[in-house]
């Protein structure tokens, strides 16, 4: 994943997105569904109907970037909400991109060295 500047927020756009949409179509969804400026520098993540493809829209200060990832097996974990946005941490975004369930992470207890 590309390093994000400090203070960058990550938003999952709930619901199903038409993955045929490109820069302008996804930016319009950000404006209407989340009421956030897509040129704010925050990261916006969209998932299609099948669940194996996500798109990430990000303004890097010079232009819009659009990243896509398709899982070879399985589906990306997505919230049940039909609309709106859900804030993720950068760590949760990394887990999402790896196909890990970012909602139920468990920290293991450190082992005791005797």
Regions found by a protein language model. Give the residues of each.
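Polybasic/polar functional segments that serve as interface/processing modules
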Residues: 1-114
